[in-house]
């Protein structure tokens, strides 16, 4: 069977394809996709690297179609119209829109099937579940501190989607947004009333380039401020499992004090 020609229009999909060992099938990606650690990207189709087709919300669809993909990968409700536009051009689109942690993990298997690597997808999902089980064991029967997670700061927005699940999986409480609900602007007074034990900042598009001191200066914040790379919590990719592990270590450092600093739970 010939390896499919894959165009990924979502950084999270690209990261998942790479984790599946299928980056060699990518013939096109967005300007925001990171394949810097995957030298094999595009190699199954004799190209040095996948073609950049533009932004993740405004890619050049003529360029996408010109790559003659067998499947185009999209993700998130913000790309639903884009997925429809690709279908109108006769392209086969695999659009995935996870909103909870369970759906993200299940999506690894689905993505494997999307790119012709179903067994790899099942393995990746199983590995993610095992990691979550290890975290659950490590934080079991411990007090659950409250965390406030902010994915945008002007105005302040409490993270939603899978982040509430991630905090709970890490052994914390998250009273700001229900699992599966979209991120939303938060009332500073509500955050103050919740009296979080930790503030976690992961601003979209900023990586880890946020000054925690600027957040700590707010008169409604009275807790340690932690800055995480936004890819650890904002994307439904395998990096989200790294994010859950980081959260668990922030919320329960004593649970991991015996293991090495870089060891998984």
Describe each region flagged by the PLM.
Residues 1-265:
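N-terminal ligand-binding lobe of clamshell/alpha-beta domains
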């Amino acid at each position: 069977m010939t390896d499919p020609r894959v165009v990924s229009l979502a950084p999270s999909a690209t990261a998942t394809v790479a984790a599946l060992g299928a980056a060699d099938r990518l013939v096109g990606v967005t300007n925001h996709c990171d394949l810097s650690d995957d030298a094999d990207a595009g190699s199954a189709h004799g190209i040095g690297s996948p073609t950049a087709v533009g932004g993740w919300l405004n890619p050049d669809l003529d360029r996408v179609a010109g790559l003659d993909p067998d499947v185009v990968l999209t993700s998130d409700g913000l790309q639903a119209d884009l997925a429809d536009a690709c279908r109108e051009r006769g392209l086969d689109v695999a659009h995935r829109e996870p909103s909870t942690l369970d759906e993200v993990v299940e999506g690894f298997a689905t993505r494997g099937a999307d790119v012709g690597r179903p067994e790899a997808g099942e393995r990746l999902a199983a590995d993610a579940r095992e990691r979550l089980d290890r975290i659950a064991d490590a934080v079991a029967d411990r007090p659950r501190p409250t965390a406030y997670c902010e994915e945008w700061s002007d105005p302040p927005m409490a993270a939603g989607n899978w982040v509430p699940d991630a905090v709970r999986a890490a052994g914390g409480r998250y009273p700001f947004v229900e699992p599966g609900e979209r991120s939303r602007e938060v009332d500073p007074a509500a955050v103050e009333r919740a009296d979080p034990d930790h503030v976690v900042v992961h601003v979209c598009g900023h990586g880890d380039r946020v000054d925690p001191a600027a957040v700590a200066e707010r008169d409604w914040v009275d807790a340690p401020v932690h800055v995480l790379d936004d890819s650890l919590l904002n994307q439904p990719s395998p990096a989200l499992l790294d994010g859950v592990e980081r959260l668990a270590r922030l919320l329960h450092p004593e649970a991991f004090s015996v293991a090495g600093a870089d060891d998984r739970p």
